[in-house]
């Protein structure tokens, strides 16, 4: 899988979109799989809990829908697109550390049925998200 390594330590995969609030979005037809980025999980450090969104919940882009708790802080997870939550990653209730171990794979948080595909254009490309990390980190 093609990736960008930012600052020698933050992995950004090239097959998905990103949000300014550090969510990644993998679009498959009208479904979006959402998780938090490698950058976000490294900033949070050891993740110890996850509050998952409700199934069938209708959400708008930028609505807070989930919470990830680490030993350091709790962080809201925002829906990057409008739609309906159709699935959540139940493995995270027992093993929240999957977000640290595999943020772009087994650590996914929820799946969304997209209601407005035009919103995808507002998301960041891997290159733009990489630039955002560089700005934040002074790289």
UniProtKB/Swiss-Prot annotation:
Keywords: Lipoyl
Coiled coil: none
PROSITE patterns to which the protein is assigned, alphabetical: BIOTINYL_LIPOYL, LIPOYL
Cofactor: (R)-lipoate
Lipoyl-binding domain segment(s): 31-113
Cofactor note: Binds 1 lipoyl cofactor covalently.
A GO CC annotation given for this chain: glycine cleavage complex
List of residues that carry N6-lipoyllysine: 72
Pfam families: GCV_H
GO terms for biological process, alphabetical: glycine decarboxylation via glycine cleavage system
Cystine pairings recorded for this chain: none
InterPro entries, A to Z: 2-oxoA_DH_lipoyl-BS, Biotin_lipoyl, GCV_H, GCV_H/Fam206, GCV_H_sub, Single_hybrid_motif
Superkingdom of this protein's organism: Archaea
Function: The glycine cleavage system catalyzes the degradation of glycine. The H protein shuttles the methylamine group of glycine from the P protein to the T protein.
Family classification: Belongs to the GcvH family.
PANTHER family linked: GLYCINE CLEAVAGE SYSTEM H PROTEIN, GLYCINE CLEAVAGE SYSTEM H PROTEIN-RELATED
Listed NCBIfam families: gcvH (TIGR00527), PRK01202.1 (NF002270)
Subunit structure: The glycine cleavage system is composed of four proteins: P, T, L and H.
Name of the molecule in the record: Probable glycine cleavage system H protein 1
């Amino acid at each position: 899988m093609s990736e960008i390594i930012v600052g020698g330590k933050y992995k950004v995969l090239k097959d998905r979109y990103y949000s300014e609030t550090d969510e990644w979005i993998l679009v498959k037809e009208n479904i979006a799989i959402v998780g938090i980025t490698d950058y976000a999980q490294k900033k949070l450090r050891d993740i110890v809990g996850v509050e998952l969104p409700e199934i069938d919940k209708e959400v708008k882009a930028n609505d807070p829908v989930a919470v990830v708790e680490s030993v350091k802080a709790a962080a809201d997870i925002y829906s990057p697109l409008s739609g309906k939550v159709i699935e959540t990653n139940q493995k995270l209730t027992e093993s929240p550390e999957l977000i640290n171990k595999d943020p772009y794979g087994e650590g996914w948080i929820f799946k969304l049925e997209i209601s407005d595909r035009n919103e995808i254009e507002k998301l960041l490309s891997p290159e733009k998200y990489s630039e955002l990390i560089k700005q934040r980190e002074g790289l």
